Amino acid sequence: MRFLFLLFIVFPAIEIGIFLFLGNLIGILPTVLFMILTGIIGAAAAKKQGTEVYYKVQRDLQYGKMPGEAIADGLCIFIGGLLLMLPGFLSDLAGACLLIPFTRGWCKPILFKWLRGMSKNKRIIIK
């Protein structure tokens, strides 16, 4: 319940505050253009990296390897691309962290921990 409160009340309020602060600091037009630009860059980066991960999954499957790492990368890239396309600066920062391979390495253990927790609650099954 606390997570939903943060997601739907606190997070948008912080995003609006940052938007208003930057609008006053650099102007409304540059702020809006920056948000549009990050959305376009996010979509392009997610498409490029997503295609690379798709081919890596296929290659791993051809060699009989489990593509777990590539699938985790693909999930991070998908979520990162979505976050970059959403308007807001915190969501852009989180999306960029998921798209940059160096910082994605920090996020994947959190993703695996969350997935393992869901599998223990019988919400998903990991084989």
UniProtKB/Swiss-Prot annotation:
The lineage of its organism: Bacteria, Bacillati, Bacillota, Bacilli, Bacillales. The chain crosses the membrane at residues 3-22, 26-46, 70-90, 93-115. It is found in: Cell membrane. The keyword Transmembrane helix applies. Belongs to the UPF0716 (FxsA) family. It is a multi-pass membrane protein. NCBIfam families: PRK11463.1-2. This is UPF0716 protein YtzA. Coiled coil: none annotated. InterPro entries: FxsA. GO terms for cellular component: plasma membrane. Signal peptide: none annotated. Keywords: Cell membrane, Membrane, Transmembrane, Transmembrane helix.
